[in-house]
């Protein structure tokens, strides 16, 4: 079942995409068309989604991803993982949009035709000299391969759903009394004191038997893998870097030394030649012999990385984000992640460049032998685990004693609480969540608890509460958050119910 979390914000974005991208659509949409897409049809209750409409929506989603993420995310329209993700997003959006559209039609959110006309007239893509231009309007509809009536219907649907969302978000579903109680909770602060528990001098286990070390090694062999490592060969493809190198040697001499300097005089090929080379490379990269011939024939410069692993990847000539993407997604390997591809992989960057990469050398991950180095590593692991366990048990005992009025162990370890620290619900961290999850202590009592912070162990004392006045801006922000939260809960409930009661059938598939 599709996830429904944060559906309100996602849905509003989805609804905007429906029309905004129809208006902004460009001629290069065809670059994203799926290959090998057989007859595809989705039926949601009585709404049928044709194969053509699915492709169009897929294209819009690709366009949105490229425009929104720019160079932050590497997208490859031929990458199976990328195709799968975009396909699932498109399918989910189509289903929820159709269900909501059917629901809104049942509610009779009628939009006057004048609003539709006004909306279309205001779209900048259809305007010329600050006026609506009919020629531009029909020109863009032609690019979309959509009729004016179809476009008007889509605008009508968009405005109906937008009106429904507006009505939902503007309706106050929460009682004033409930709202005031929530505001009072936000006006409450809590006072705590902390003590750093330093038990570094604690006596640890001194001897661990060889039998215990071997048992740990056998049960945790995955911890002692020497990582798979590989060297990558690559080159960059763009229309400016395919050269014919004319190499000449230049000798420079002086009275003390003789220097030999090699000059690479690189002459660009014509645009037509470059385009032809790139086209051949992109279409023959899975044919290793043809691919190598093109590289050799055109003297394309190949670069090589040093040994790389899953955790150690650095090469000054490759963007770090690209290397991270390559390694984390195992794109140079087959699906089993241990067999390398015997042909190059092409990664399309968002700046119209492409990197062509393949693995030059590869060594599989192997389990290290039970050597002295591994024994030492296991000893440190077991000592550290034992240390943590003992320390935590001691702090638990301190907390138990303090909560029962006994300060004996606390004093023995010479622990002290710091000055008071003040927390409100506006602090956003795990410690704040912990503090506000505790009950308010009775008069004269204190509540003690343990908290880990960056491998350090702290003992906290919750002693009192205080109140402060919220500003008008803060009250407005909280009220808005409460209202949005309630609207989201209601919309999620509506969508979940619509999904559960819907008849959804699929016909066809995507390769």
From Swiss-Prot:
Residues 227-281 form the PpiC domain. Keywords: Cell membrane, Chaperone, Membrane, Transmembrane, Transmembrane helix. GO terms for cellular component: plasma membrane. It comes from the Bacteria. It is a single-pass type II membrane protein. Coiled coil: none annotated. Residues 30-511 are extracellular. One of its GO terms (molecular function) is peptidyl-prolyl cis-trans isomerase activity. Pfam families: Rotamase_2, SurA_N_3. Residues 1-8 are cytoplasmic. The chain crosses the membrane at residues 9-29. It is found in: Cell membrane. Chaperone that functions as a gatekeeper on the extracellular side of the Sec translocon. Facilitates the translocation of precursor proteins across Sec by interacting with the translocating substrate. Also plays a role in the release of newly synthesized secreted proteins at the extracellular exit site of the Sec translocon. Belongs to the PpiD chaperone family. Interacts with the Sec translocon. Binds to the lateral gate of SecY. Forms a complex with YfgM. This is Putative chaperone PpiD. It comes from Buchnera aphidicola subsp. Baizongia pistaciae (strain Bp).
């Amino acid at each position: 079942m599709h996830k429904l979390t944060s559906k309100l914000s996602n849905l509003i974005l989805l609804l905007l995409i429906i029309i905004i991208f129809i208006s902004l659509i460009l001629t290069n949409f065809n670059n994203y068309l799926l290959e090998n897409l057989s007859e595809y049809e989705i039926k949601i209750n009585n709404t049928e989604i044709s194969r053509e409409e699915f492709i169009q929506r897929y294209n819009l989603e690709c366009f949105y991803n490229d425009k929104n993420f720019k160079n932050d995310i590497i997208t490859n329209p031929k990458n199976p993982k990328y195709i799968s993700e975009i396909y699932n997003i498109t399918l989910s959006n189509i289903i929820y949009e159709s269900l909501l559209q059917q629901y809104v039609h049942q509610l009779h959110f009628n939009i006057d035709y004048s609003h539709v006309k006004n909306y279309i007239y205001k779209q900048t893509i259809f305007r010329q000299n600050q006026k609506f231009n009919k020629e531009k309007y029909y020109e863009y509809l032609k690019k979309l391969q959509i009729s004016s009536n179809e476009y008007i219907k889509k605008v009508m649907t968009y405005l109906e759903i937008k009106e429904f969302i507006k009505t939902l978000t503007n309706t106050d579903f929460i009682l004033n009394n409930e709202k005031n109680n929530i505001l009072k909770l936000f006006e409450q602060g809590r006072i705590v004191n902390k003590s750093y528990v330093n038990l570094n001098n604690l006596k640890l286990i001194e001897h661990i038997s060889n039998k215990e070390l071997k048992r740990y090694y056998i049960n945790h062999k995955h911890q002692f893998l020497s990582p798979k490592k590989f060297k990558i060969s690559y080159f960059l493809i763009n229309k400016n870097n395919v050269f014919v190198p004319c190499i000449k040697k230049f000798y420079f001499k002086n009275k003390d030394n003789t220097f030999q300097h090699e000059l690479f005089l690189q002459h660009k090929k014509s645009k037509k030649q470059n385009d032809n080379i790139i086209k051949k490379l992109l279409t023959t990269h899975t044919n290793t012999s043809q691919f190598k011939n093109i590289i050799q024939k055109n003297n394309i410069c190949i670069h090589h990385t040093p040994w790389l692993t899953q955790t150690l990847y650095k090469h000054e000539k490759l963007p770090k984000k690209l290397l991270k993407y390559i390694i984390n997604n195992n794109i140079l390997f087959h699906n089993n992640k241990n067999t390398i591809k015997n042909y190059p992989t092409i990664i399309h960057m968002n700046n119209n460049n492409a990197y062509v990469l393949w693995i030059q050398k590869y060594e599989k991950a192997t389990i290290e032998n039970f050597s002295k180095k591994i024994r030492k590593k296991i000893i440190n692991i077991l000592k550290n685990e034992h240390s943590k366990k003992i320390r935590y048990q001691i702090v638990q005992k301190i907390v138990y004693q303090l909560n029962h009025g006994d300060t004996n162990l606390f004093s023995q370890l010479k622990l002290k609480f710091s000055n008071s620290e003040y927390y409100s619900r506006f602090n956003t961290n795990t410690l704040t969540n912990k503090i506000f999850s505790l009950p308010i202590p009775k008069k004269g009592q204190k509540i003690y608890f343990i908290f880990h912070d960056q491998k350090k162990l702290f003992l906290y004392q919750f002693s009192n509460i205080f109140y402060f006045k919220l500003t008008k801006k803060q009250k407005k922000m909280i009220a808005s958050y409460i209202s949005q939260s309630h609207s989201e809960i209601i919309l999620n409930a509506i969508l979940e119910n619509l999904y559960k009661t819907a008849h959804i059938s699929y016909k066809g598939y995507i390769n």
